Structures are given as C-alpha cells and as structure tokens.
Design a protein with these regions (language model features):
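Rossmann-like NAD(P)-binding element
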Residues: 55-100
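NAD(P)+-binding Rossmann beta1-loop-alpha1 motif at the extreme N-terminus of oxidoreductases
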Residues: 1-54, 59-62, 66-69
Length: 100
C-alpha cells in the first residue's frame, strides 16, 4: 500500500482518488487555499458536488495549511491536480519545501 498525496480537491484531483482507492492505496487529498469550503464539505458528506457522486470514506481530506506536515510524512507519490488558479501557489510551495 502506497501513501498518495493528491493536491487539489476539484474534478481532476478527486477523480484520481477512485483508481488509487480501488488499488488499495492510502489517499490524502489536500485542497488549495481556494478550496477550504470544499474540503470541509467533503470531510463531512463525502459527496463531491461537481462530480455529482460520492467519494470514498477512506480518503483523508485536509486543508492547504497541512501541506508541510504531509510532505514531511514522505508520501510515495505526490499528484498535483490543481487548476490554473492554483498552479502558481503549489509550484512555489513545493519549491520551498522540497528544494530549499
């Protein structure tokens, strides 16, 4: 079982959780700073309004302020699934955490 960190709780990041969970991996979805409300909702209901479907209750949903802690946990795979509004944010954050 691999630890997979998916950054972005939108359509792309959330859809990627399905094959990961189906293959027995431990999945954490970390929202961008723009997705705090979505993370709160997913954590409570496990229903993704945009995808119009339930997501696995095995997924750990976290807000963006938990990024550093998640990177220190050394995930086996990091998937960046943010849209164009979030790419600058995550690029800077990953650069600061992984390469400095």
């Amino acid at each position: 079982m691999s630890k997979i960190l998916i950054i972005g709780a939108g359509v792309m990041g959330s859809a990627f959780t399905f094959p990961c969970i189906d293959n027995g991996h431990k999945v954490t979805v970390l929202g961008s700073p723009l997705e705090n409300d979505r993370i709160d909702e997913l954590s409570k209901t496990f229903f993704h309004k945009i995808l119009n479907c339930n997501v696995s209750k095995e997924i750990n949903f976290l807000k963006s302020d938990q990024l550093r802690q998640q990177l220190k946990a050394k995930p086996d795979l990091i998937v960046v699934g943010v849209n164009s509004k979030g790419i600058n944010w995550i690029s800077k954050e990953l650069n600061n955490e992984l390469f400095l």
